[in-house]
Amino acid sequence: MAQLLFRKTTQDFRDCFGLKHEILASIYNEKSTFSSENGSIQILEEAEVNALGELVRDGTVAISFGPGIYSRMFSHLRDDSDYRSALTDCVAHGWKQTRDARDVREWQRSAAIMCAERYMYKVRQAYKRVVENLDHMYAWHYLTEGPSEHVFILPAMYESVRHETTSEAYGMQCGGIIGGNVSLMLPRDEQYTTLFKAWLMSLAKMSLSELREPHWNGVRVQLSRDHRILYYGDLLPSDGDITYLVNKLEYHTIWFPEGDFETMMGAMLRDSFPAGCHAHLNIPVPHYFVFDTDDDLILRCWKGVRDTWIKLRLGYEEGGVNDSRMSEALIVNRDLPADLSESLFCCCLARGVSRDQVRTLKDVRNVAQAQIRHVVSGQGVWWEHMVRGQPLACSIRPGKVVLVVDYEDGPLHVSIRVRLLNVHYARELGMKASDVVVRIPTSNRPRWVETKEYERSLRFYEFRPGPITTEFHHVFAFYCYWGCGRVEKRRHLYQIREVRRGNLYSRSRFLRRIAEDGEKVKVQGRTHVTATRAVQHEKCNPNEDIIYSREFARELALTGKIKEAGALAVIYTCMQTLGVDIDPPAGWVREGRPKQRTAKLCHLLTRILTAFFSYRGGSSSLVCSVMVVIFSIILYYLRLKHVDQEVRYDELTLIWYGDGGVELQRILREVSMTRFVAVAGDPATPEYIAQAKLWANKKSNIVVFNYARPYERGPVFENLIRDTVSLREAAEVFILRTDDSWSQYGNTVVAMLGEGDFCDLVHFGASCDPMEHYFVHISQPPGTNPGYEPANQEEPFEEWLYETQAMERVIPTTWESEIVDARGMLVSILTFHFRFAGWFELDVPGDDIGRGLQLMGSINKVVHVSCFVQNGRRYFRLSVDLDVDRVLRNMRHEGDALMAAELFVTDAVLVCEGLVVGEMHRLQRTYRSVNAMVYHQGMTNFIVYEWMRRVLLTNLLDEMLVFDIGGRNGELSGWVVQDVKVHYFCVDPAGEEAIPKGQRVRLPGGRAIWDIAETVEQNVARYLEVVGKPQTPAEGIILIFSNSIVAAYEAAGRNNRNQVANLYQQLQAWGGRVFIRDQLVPTRANPGDYWIQAAFPGNVYPPGLCEDFNIDPDAGILPLRYPDTGQGATDVVLANGRLGHLTSSWFQSLYCGAARGFILNGFGRLIWPIYCRHVVVLATRP
């Protein structure tokens, strides 16, 4: 079993604090909305409306908020009449419009939002009373006199509102500490801990009756528990939702502000009341919980067991746990029932349970019994108890609480330079703003200087998850693998292949979870929670070029159905990857009862899309599920294309197994598809498959298996897949959702199919994962000519997935998930251990801006500078995004010291000194959504590093000369200079900056270039002569070509393929080592053909919407900056054993994206499986 990655964070503790100006802005922001404050609504019990539209039952809803002033709930501000009144109004308004009681959940959700926003208004008014009394009722704790930020202690503000004032609660005249300042030069978490303890001590001192100094180690502060969820509506039963039941408990938290963990533990064990604590504290101040009765403690323990299950389940689904602790089980001072005692131990050992399976207390108890038997039998756990080499079953004494020690620790290694000519103009420019962006070039003669003055003050923040940028037409696009052209078989340099599984698989999912903001997408400048909500939004419409790209879509758009027209235009264009044309005839929209089959089909699809766009909300995967239904209906039509019988779509039988079926059923009812059957549950279980076989006794038109457990692996899951695919015999069109695991069992599945059957893999743009596919099988159709077979069947489509998913060790896997400080981040990069990307901040006095720019310019050439005043002194805040290339190029690590190359900061200092004073603020940065080409280029240097590392391992020479052809400013220098015997030389006439870890090759007449009129040996000989090493053997020389080298040859003559092929032949014969970056492997033998078959992407969208692609009528579709190497070059590579391909898999590219701060945009996710199949790098064997 794969080891679950655990990444311990302090975010729970950091959420207890808020910057003063941000908190005040939230309190006085009257335009705050439920969604802007990250509000969440959960419907526990659905409201009930009778046939007359009268509200019979209110139901129950739970409301919660993200970090901030609303995160902790005030029960005294809650009013059930607000919810009742809002729900009555929503039901009355909704009933007038639809008269459909099935919409009651949406009415209930709308009422909850209205109620929540009324509650938010009351919270703001309560906090206003607190901040208006800051000066005379509360104290401000100052930790430093230097540059600092002022922060509120949110729990202190919460206590002030809950008890009206803290002074009333404690009978004192002072309200205690409510905030303070934290130094910008010291670690933030340590200062937060000091400030939190100071607040608790202020409460303790107010409650002391004696003046003598107490023993501070034993001081304790008792506070009532805080609430994070607010419930409205009807009461739930005593064995109902367990979160609801625990929320109703009133217990206390005992804090030890000056004590240690052992002191707290001893006090908890001696407490006369039922009590418990966590083994790992999310707030680093010792504390435990005290309950009124044993039953309350037991209920809270069951909640801990349940929360651990859910956390583990999500961890395996998402690749890891990013939290303050792994286990939520409590250590208690009471003897517990045997089943609970054993569950506190067993809950940590298996894969967890989904939230829906353990909603109620009864569910938790039932699952606990089953899991105890599961663990005791030794099945399905990640650990083994060994005695003398023999595995033993787990033995737990009833009534004894056992702590899993050290489980929380997890695995150990789980631009242009502008010279200012007018100083006065620079100052005038600065006076117009309080912040500015400056560029810091490297000095002409760089020397290495130490950066220790500001290393301790430097702060690092990880990027926040970012939304995926996409467009309307990308969501409805798809393609079939077999229709995307054929690529010649490659020769890989590294033949160590591993299927993506185990720990690497978990980490890849974990990387996506950290970098991507859930399933949020950004469309046309607006951020939406899901792609489903995005395309349903009234202001999200397709581009006109899409609508008018097909005549039938233009006709539909004229009727006002803009979204439907745009979606159908994309869908019908994508069907051309199957080589079919099913456009309806002219005038099809005006036919009331169409008789022509293509018109009838188009009318049906239009009604489905209309029902989907008008559907209120829906899950994140709903749009993808709708696309699967539409695609399956089209395939069913194609299967019967040559059959004379009439097709009646209202009699179409479609069985949907797995997630999304209930929502689809509501949509398809609107179009009279009454024979759609949704079978709820998890398809990835033997019990579910047994149930499916009962449905399979009768032939169905379409069967869809929508799997939702992608983290499962192993022979048991493969057998389950085989059993599932065997059910295809009960369907004419069979579709199975799968992911990268297809590379393990795909060949077996294809071998099960009958002769003449059609099968393919389909990739939908609506899918959130580039490696999620749908396997399609169509049984042999009646008739002799099915009319939809792909033109090219020479290569099995499984090879597409293997090339893009199987593991090739071309990227270093030295990945670290632990959180480190700013200096640790820089040291990790310099030792080629990569982590999650982020940004750096530094505050420097106004008279020392030069040294600050020196350090920050070594991390990124572009520096954001703002000016503020602190304690009457002028400061500058410098912030930069992490640039891995820049750090490796301009910094080095010597012993314990960090050294940076000297930069030219004079011009930037002049601009910064002219800034006016503004408010101090922190820029919140997210992972950047980039196109496929930027994402792929971000991987290349990682590949170069690993290849260079292998070269050095096999090299026996005293020195190696690296010539980077087209290296611009030597961004690659830090990646290849891994040893003192490596010397880097840049050959490029366009570079502007000096290279600290190398030098440029300069000729008497200027900078050296690669002369395409000369041979490889002649060019190399000229370089060696210039650098003074003419006797260097070829074995000691490395040539690294940028992706512009082939373009340079092509520029000499149109389609200059022969010269390019000649270059590759020379490189094959030459004795040195060669690396060629980012080349394009053509699809066809004819160099003039498209690199991807004409059906994609040129016909998927109009040329103007093919993002990042040039449309050349002579050469076909070429991606920008990636020239076509020509078939001749590929033939040379395949014919000779010296040059080979280096291709990285999708999950390895995630490492690079996370290290650079990139996430792939919507079009990139659509095209990525094909893109990384064609764009490769070439190199000689190390």
Curated annotation (Swiss-Prot):
<protein>
    <recommendedName>
        <fullName>Uncharacterized protein VP3</fullName>
    </recommendedName>
</protein>
<feature type="transmembrane region" description="Helical">
    <location>
        <begin position="618"/>
        <end position="638"/>
    </location>
</feature>
<dbReference type="GO" id="GO:0016020">
    <property type="term" value="C:membrane"/>
</dbReference>
<keyword id="KW-1043">Host membrane</keyword>
<dbReference type="Pfam" id="PF18965">
    <property type="entry name" value="VP3-like"/>
</dbReference>
<dbReference type="GO" id="GO:0033644">
    <property type="term" value="C:host cell membrane"/>
</dbReference>
<keyword id="KW-0812">Transmembrane</keyword>
<dbReference type="InterPro" id="IPR045917">
    <property type="entry name" value="VP3-like"/>
</dbReference>
<keyword id="KW-1133">Transmembrane helix</keyword>
<keyword id="KW-0472">Membrane</keyword>
